[in-house]
A protein has these predicted regions:
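Short acidic/polar active-site loop segments enriched in Thr and Asp
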Residues: 81-82, 181, 200
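Zn-dependent metallopeptidase/amidohydrolase metal-coordination segment
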Residues: 185-223
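Generic non-transmembrane alpha-helical segments
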Residues: 136, 140-151, 238-246
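Acidic, Ser/Thr-rich low-complexity intrinsically disordered segments
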Residues: 261-291
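Metabolite-binding pocket within alpha/beta catalytic cores that recognizes anionic/polar moieties
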Residues: 1-130, 286-291
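Non-catalytic positions within long, well-ordered alpha-helices that form the structural scaffold/packing
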Residues: 76-79, 176, 195
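Active-site/ligand-binding-proximal alpha/beta "capping" segment
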Residues: 147-181, 267
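His/Asp/Glu-rich mid-to-C-terminal helical/loop segments that flank catalytic regions of hydrolases
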Residues: 212-260
C-alpha cells in the first residue's frame, strides 16, 4: 500500500501550522503557474504533513487571484494522498452559528472567473463529481473533532461564490431558501481539481458569520469575521493535530474512487493527445498517461 501523506490547506486566519516538526520549506515549480506559496513539509505524530496557506502569508491573495491549478499540482508533486481544506465560511442556518464547524459533503459552484480543470483541448477528461468529498476523510475528521470536543456538523452543502465582495441580501436569501448550509469563496474549483488529480479531499468549513440574511445580525463585515477567525483557527489547529494522531499511516483506497478518478475519465484517443498538454499533466495524470 501507499504511505499516507496528509495535505492541509490553510484558509483565512490559518497561515502556519503549530506543532509541525522537522519543518522543511520547499518552493515547488508548477507548469500551471505560481502557487499561493511554498509548501511546508513536516511531521505530526509521525505522520507526514504538507501544509500550504491558500492566501499566502499576510493574506495577499484574494479568492479570485488564487492559482488553484498550481496549488493542487504542487501538492500532488509533494506526494499528498489526502487533502483537508480548512475554510472560513458564512452560515445560512440558525443551528450553524459562528464558531461551529461543518464537514461539507456537497458543493454548488457559483464561480465564473477561474480555471476549473487541468484538462481541455488536446486531452479531454470528465471526472465524476457526484460525491465530491471523501467519506473516509470525513469519518476521521468527525472522530478528531469529537476527541477535541469541537462542535461540528457531520454534513452540509457549501455554495462557492466568486467574491471578493460578500453577498447581497437577495443572494443570501436565495441560497438560504435553496437549503444550502454555508457559503465561501475558495473551495471551488479546488475540490474539482483535487478530484482530477486523484487526491482524496475533504473540507472543514469554519463558520464566522450569518452572511446577511439573519434579521438579528448586521450585514457581515471583515471586523466581525476577524473576531471569530482567531478562535476558529485555534480549534482548527487542534483538530489537525488530533487528526494526525488517529490517521492511518497507509493510504486506504477511497470507497468512492477519488484516488482512481481518471481511470474512467479520459476520452481523447492517445494519438490525438497534445504532447505539450501531456507534459503539464505529468504529476496530475501521470499514473494514467504512463500506464
Amino acid at each position: 500500500m501507499t504511505k499516507a501523506v496528509l495535505g492541509i490547506i490553510g484558509g483565512s486566519g490559518i497561515y502556519d501550522l503549530p506543532g509541525l516538526q522537522d519543518v522543511r520549506e520547499e518552493a515547488i515549480k508548477s507548469p500551471w503557474g505560481e502557487p499561493s506559496s511554498p509548501v511546508r513539509h513536516g511531521i505530526i505524530a509521525e505522520l507526514p504533513i504538507v501544509f500550504m496557506p491558500r492566501h499566502d502569508k499576510g493574506h495577499r491573495l484574494s479568492p479570485s487571484d488564487i492559482n488553484y491549478r498550481a496549488n493542487i499540482d504542487v501538492l500532488k508533486r509533494a506526494g499528498v494522498t489526502d487533502l483537508v481544506s480548512l475554510s472560513a465560511c458564512g452560515s445560512f442556518k440558525e443551528e450553524l452559528p459562528p464558531g461551529m464547524f461543518v464537514l461539507v459533503d456537497q458543493f454548488v459552484d457559483r464561480t465564473h472567473k477561474r480555471e476549473s480543470s487541468f484538462f481541455g483541448k488536446g486531452c479531454v477528461a470528465h471526472v465524476s463529481m457526484a460525491h465530491p468529498v471523501s467519506p473516509r476523510l470525513r469519518i476521521h475528521l468527525a472522530a478528531a473533532a469529537e476527541a477535541e470536543d469541537i462542535a461540528i456538523a457531520r454534513a452540509g452543502t457549501y455554495v462557492c461564490m466568486e467574491g471578493p465582495q460578500f453577498s447581497t441580501y437577495a443572494e443570501s436569501m436565495t441560497y438560504k431558501n435553496l437549503g444550502y448550509s454555508v457559503i465561501g469563496m475558495t473551495n471551488m474549483p479546488e475540490a474539482k481539481l483535487a478530484r482530477e488529480a486523484e487526491i482524496c479531499y475533504a473540507t472543514v468549513a469554519m463558520v464566522t458569520d450569518f452572511d446577511c440574511w439573519h434579521p438579528d445580525h448586521d450585514a457581515v463585515t471583515m471586523q466581525d469575521i476577524i473576531r471569530v477567525l482567531a478562535s476558529n483557527a485555534d480549534k482548527a489547529k487542534n483538530l489537525v493535530a488530533r487528526l494526525a494522531r488517529i490517521f492511518p499511516r497507509e493510504h486506504e483506497p477511497c470507497p468512492i474512487g477519488s484516488d482512481r478518478a481518471l481511470e474512467t475519465a479520459l476520452i481523447t484517443a492517445p494519438e490525438a493527445r497534445d504532447p505539450e498538454l501531456l507534459k503539464k499533466l505529468d504529476a496530475v495524470a501521470g499514473r494514467i498517461l504512463r500506464g
